Amino acid sequence: MGFLDLPFMLKAFRFRRLVVEDGKRRKKKKPLWLTPVSHGYYTVDRLSYADNSSNDDSVFVQREQQSDELEIWLFGVSNAGTGKEIVKYMQNHLFDKLPNELGIMRKCKETMRRAYVEEERTGGSAASVMVVNGEKLAIASIGDHRVVVCKDGEAHQIRDRKASTKHWSQFIFPVCNQGEEEDESDPRNSELVVITEKINSDTEFIIIGSPGIWEVMKSQEAINLIRHIEDPKEAAKCLAKEALNRISKSSISCVVIRFG
């Protein structure tokens, strides 16, 4: 009798294993929010000064989540008026037709590049960051607005990878060119840069800052100043206040995006 029931038992075992494996596959499809995203921003109000009223910044923060598996954050700082046009373009060409997760980064990069084309023609200045599912970044900048990523306490300024390639003279005469790599006033910064990269375990936070931040402090200075501040709102306020204390002449606005 036991031998007669053996085929049935084998079928039941196969069915049970199939259900378990299918359950595992379904669990893998669920999004894992391993990297929480928090943010804060601060703008120094200079409307009372007539000579600075034309240099005010626009700060924009927008979150889009159309499904349980796709969340997009858009952060940015730009010249007044520029930010509105960038966000408007994003809304019309990305947020209303979000692709699936596989094609989202390519779509983000293409849309950001097109959104910045007009600013590139008119000499506008802006910087923005897209955070997709707390796992990937799409970053764009043009002009004097800058994006700096903190990785294990070190500042990484976003630049075009091709433009950042060393010239042959830097290998032959490293001493003579030692200061060139650290020159943050490089004219190449005025060119449009759009890149994508992953958020790794060493990615701590991101600073998006206006010219008023960067004309009075280096990228590493800004990182060192706020790295110990866990609240991104307080970090952004601290950074802006420090720029003001250093008598920055340009507009002062910043966004701090913290991971984990």
Swiss-Prot record:
* Entries under InterPro entries matching the protein: PP2C, PPM-type-like_dom_sf, PPM-type_phosphatase-like_dom
Q: Which SUPFAM superfamilies match?
A: PP2C-like
CDD domains, per the entry: PP2Cc
Q: Which Pfam families match?
A: PP2C
Its family? Belongs to the PP2C family.
> In this protein, which residues make up the domain named PPM-type phosphatase?
41-259
One function term, GO molecular function aspect = protein serine/threonine phosphatase activity
Gene3D superfamilies per the UniProt record, alphabetical: PPM-type phosphatase domain (3.60.40.10)
Query: What PANTHER family does UniProt report for this protein, alphabetically?
Result: PROTEIN PHOSPHATASE
The protein's superkingdom reads Eukaryota
Q: What is this protein called?
A: Putative protein phosphatase 2C-like protein 44
Q: Which organism is it from?
A: Arabidopsis thaliana (Mouse-ear cress)
